[in-house]
Amino acid sequence: MKIKAAAVVLIFLAAGLLFDTGLAQGIRKPVWAGQFYESDPTRLAYLIDSFLQAANPSSVQGQIVGLVSPHAGYIYSGQIAAHGYQLVRNLDISTVVIIGPSHQVGFEGCSIYLKGSFQTPLGLAAVAEILAG
């Protein structure tokens, strides 16, 4: 009986998390905005533009087919990331695959957000549902 009660409580808690993060509406709310990066769109855009303007990466011989970029807080890794993004800024890129660790829950394997969008301070980033599914 205690196990059933605990299971019911866990289900309600999990459902609450879905609504808090916007998963029920298909929009994943930002969890770290204001901590790892600016939550204010104007300030975030200015910070990103500043990093990109200061970046002057060396040219790359050959075709760029992928980019590995740090994902730490922008104050720590933004300038380094900007060097990579400057290299691909003018390329015709239709899909970006973002791979990163979970900072909220530990688990084995991987998790793929199958459909919807990620809310960012700069707007929605749609999931490529055909690739995700």
PLM regions with names:
Residues 1-9:
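Bacterial N-terminal signal peptides that target proteins for export
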Residues 8-18:
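Bacterial N-terminal signal peptides
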Residues 19-24:
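Sec/Tat signal peptide C-region and signal peptidase I cleavage site
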Residues 25-133:
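Active-site histidine-anchored catalytic micro-motif
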